[in-house]
Amino acid sequence: MKVLTELQKQIFTIVKKENGKPIPPGIVVRMMENSPNFPGKHLIYRAIDDLLDWAILRKAGGVTNQLLVNYEPAEPLLDKKLQGILTLGNKNSGFIRSLDDDKTVYYVHYSNLTGALDGDLVEFCKLDKPQFGDKFDAAVITILKRARILYAGNFLVDQNEFALEYKIVADNPRFYLTMIVNPDSIPNNLASNTKIAFQIDEYDPDNNLCKVSVQQVLGNNDDPLINIKAIMLDNSIVFETNDVVEQHANKLSFDTEEQHKAYRQDLTDLAFVTVDPTTSKDLDDAIYVKTIPTGFVLYVAIADVAHYVNRNSEIDIEAKHKTSSIYLPGHYVVPMLPEQLSNQLCSLNPAQKRYVVVCEISFDNQGRIKTNKLYPATIISKNRFSYDQVNKWLNNKSELNCDETVINSLKAAFTLSDLIQAQRQKRGTIDLSHKETEIVVDEHYFPIKINFLVHDKAETMIENLMVVANETVAWVLTNNKIALPYRVHPRPSKKKLQSLIETVGELNITKPQFNLDTVTSSQIASWLNENKDNPSYEIFVILLLRTLGKAFYSVNPLMHFSIGSNHYTHFTSPIRRYIDLTIHRLLWMHLFTPDQFTDNERDQLKQELEKIADTVNDTEIKIINCERNANDYLTTLLLSKQIGKTFSGFISAITSFGIFMRMDENNFDGLIKITTIPDDFFIFEKEKMVLKGRKTNKVYKIGDRLEAKLSEIDFIQKRAILTLI
């Protein structure tokens, strides 16, 4: 943390006494000239520069660059030290969520970071100053553990008349430390403009300096695929499979031992099919539906990954570390499991015998569940369909090349899906569907265009059948008093709901009548449906998504609010999600073949569940950030060829530094900086989430339609900069 010298304190006091009125640096010097200990102009200007560098003072702007107070420092309260995780914002101030108390969140100014970076585990303390809003100020005392070992950056060589100067520019804009590159770490003939991975060897917290060394050469900085790998590295994502793990996987094969017949049902005669995106290779799930006089019987067959991946094996250890497959733009996939398993042995490829775990559910003619069974089985998928194929068949645009039994099963599946959908809506499932896009790339991974995704009937059918299977498995395990990781989504807080209601009120969205303390998912769903025809419905859904927050895994049996379910888990994707694989192991250990496992093995897994859930939750956030960063990078790369083009859109967010406009053409948010908005000086009113002109009272609010010109691309922030027309 920065400790001000007496000279810096004097300068700060002079600026503060102006009570918000800008003061020129020269006036500060003049006011100090009569001091008996006048240090000289040079030292005063240097001290002012330090206060500006530390963001304790700021420039008011304009030609004169007059000084204003930006942040008031305070003494640290070192008698109580806490621990927490640091999250940095774009201006390199941040927040620490304490791990020691009730998860209180503290604000940390840039001058109090002490060299800590985004995601670091730190020891910190409160500052001796009043609470501001709902947060106390804090300062980092020391870094307990860096969030990552390697960081991605661009290696540059500057050659002047005297010597070569080596520089690294970090990809992450939140990496604020000034780097000194160890020349001995630089490989021979390493070219300028090369993407590399570096590590911090030493750091000076008082001056925000660090010594770094090159650890890995990724490739040409202008290569999009190299940049995607750098994004994964910066998010601590493993994008290569361990050679030892590959070797173990390659030794596995489909076995046909007689012992399987004792506990596996033979369902190879049933007309199972898979329906997935066109590019999918890891086919987790197959379905078969038959009609009976009293309703329907649904068979959801899920790849039996647990049969091949033993706990604590080399393959399992890596899968547990990865926690999930990653799907990046341009169909770039980083599988959780080696391809021998994910695309071959476990994938439910057509015309191949495969081991599965089946969730069999019988429904009445209204789509209400009557009975359920869970058991291991063997199936043969009769066909591999894409969503596009099935949707075209539904719309009578093409035929499916398959047997009549498959056609009958698909027809029954769609009828059942509609009934399940009606039951889900009745109990309060919230429809949060909104516009989504995909980036199309060429063979060199350069972006070509952005397409809007279509979520049609085939996608909805599979989603409904998977949701009911996931929920059924959660209920069966819960009713058998078996501990499991639930997928949970708590009720939104009263404060967040109140803020949402006030914001969407400006969009002519009807004011809901529900109680904010006891609101149900049914009431939220009804509120959405009431406004389906509102022109601002799309932004309403976006704001509601932000209000509801993110679902996560927990060993506590909490509700999944947006689905409207009291017990929910993930069972249907064990090839690509470690939680699902864990659920399968629980089924084997407790329900399918309990005699093949010891009580100690069951207890070990039970004790590990919370750690598994926490690890997956943490990694899921990194994966989401990775996917967002990759999307932003490729979108801005595509937009860089459209400088000067005019876009229409609506305001999707408002901040103290500007307006984010979601462009209709590509569904991407561009930034209109507050300093570039013409005709007035605009003030951010946080309570109302608007920008308001000081002279004209003109207001910009969320949902407003705008036109703006693309003026530049900020590749560091991966951001499109727009100018209002």
UniProtKB/Swiss-Prot annotation:
Signal peptide: none annotated. Keywords: Cytoplasm, Exonuclease, Hydrolase, Nuclease, RNA-binding. Residues 264-592 form the RNB domain. It catalyses: Exonucleolytic cleavage in the 3'- to 5'-direction to yield nucleoside 5'-phosphates. Residues 644-725 form the S1 motif domain. It is found in: Cytoplasm. The keyword Metal-binding does not apply. Belongs to the RNR ribonuclease family. RNase R subfamily. This is Ribonuclease R. It comes from Mycoplasma genitalium (strain ATCC 33530 / DSM 19775 / NCTC 10195 / G37) (Mycoplasmoides genitalium). The lineage of its organism: Bacteria, Bacillati, Mycoplasmatota, Mycoplasmoidales, Mycoplasmoidaceae. The gene is rnr.
